[in-house]
Amino acid sequence: MKELVEEMPDEGYGCTVANRFGQLLGDESDPFDILYAAGTEKKQKKKKEEPKKTSTTTKSVKKESQRDRKTILPAGGGGQVRPGHEVVEEPIQRRVTFDRKFNDAEKPPLSFSVERPVDVLDRPARGRGTGRGKGARGPGFPRSNDGFDQRGKREFERHSGSDRSSVRSEEKRSGSGSRNWGSVRDHMSVIEVASPSEEVTENEETQEAVETDGENRPSETEEVIEVAMEMTLDEWKALQEQSRPKVELNIRKTESSVPSKAVVIHKSKLLQKQDGMDEDVVFRRPANDITCQLEFNFGSLDRPTRGGRGGRGGRGRGGPSMPTLRSPQKFDSAPNPDDPEDFPALA
């Protein structure tokens, strides 16, 4: 038997609302009233905070007053402290004092001392421990006897050429280069020597500048009067022409004497020769000119007329079409322009 399956119908749930915008009417108060209420709340909070601040200030004042109650007798011990009067403590100025101060004249000269290895060996070792390696690893010896102690400057085992040339490396205290500190007096002497030379050069430059200014300035007695020049255009052009350099042309002078080979020619003979030259005009033609042998005919050109098309065989009749014979066309000869009979209107 087939199982019966019950189909549940789709059920929808909903609620009906009379006015969906009815909830917006709950806040009908004026916005200005809300702002005024917020301002009053802030003022009340400030009033509550003010007494708290005053109480904290009074507590701090009380602490200071308790400290001030302590009285200290003066160092002499002879004075008496009156009741009701407080003794004010003077601040003690603690100054850091160094060794004795020297004036410029009493200053000792600065010197740099270099200890020799003898002093280093005789002097006891500084610090907590003694020399290196005196414990279980065996006795230790200083690495180099030519320099300072082990905690001072580092000394290398080998110097360039010092072992071979038997020249010990000494500290440089003059000149230039690395490890050259010099002395303070050397630096001061260089500044003192350089400053007067600079002052002398500046004085010389100022004197030279004053001299040049005096030469360039015009004398006060001479009065310079500047007047603007006014002129017309023609005058300006004349000045320009005067200042313009003149161009020299190499012109040959005419000779006044008559040459011996000169011949007088009469004008009438020249006119007769010119008339004869105009009449006797000859056109030269090359030997290979063919234009004289050509015939020119004016009229209709020989154009073949369109004839009828030959018949074509229909479908199934594939026979070749026979060519049609055309009768020769006769054309009239062109009129001769020299013959007056061809052109009777011109006669």
UniProtKB/Swiss-Prot annotation:
Keyword Transferase part of the UniProt annotation: no
Pfam families reported in the protein's UniProt record: HABP4_PAI-RBP1, IHABP4_N
Principal cellular location given in the protein's record: nucleus
Biological-process GO terms, alphabetical: positive regulation of RNA splicing; positive regulation of translational initiation; ribosome hibernation
Segments of this protein annotated with the region Disordered: 39-221, 298-347
Compartmental location: Nucleus; Cytoplasm; Cytoplasm, Stress granule; Nucleus, Nucleolus
Keywords from the UniProt entry: Cytoplasm, Nucleus, Translation regulation
Cellular component aspect of the GO annotation: Cajal body; cytoplasm; cytoplasmic stress granule; nuclear speck; nucleolus; nucleus
Keyword Secreted in record: no
Ranges of Acidic residues composition bias in the record: 199-213, 338-347
Subunit structure: Associates with ribosomes; promoting ribosome stabilization. Interacts with eef2/eEF2; promoting ribosome stabilization.
PANTHER family, per the entry: HYALURONIC ACID-BINDING PROTEIN 4, INTRACELLULAR HYALURONAN-BINDING PROTEIN 4
Protein name: Intracellular hyaluronan-binding protein 4
Lineage, highest ranks first: Eukaryota, Metazoa, Chordata, Craniata, Vertebrata
Gene: habp4
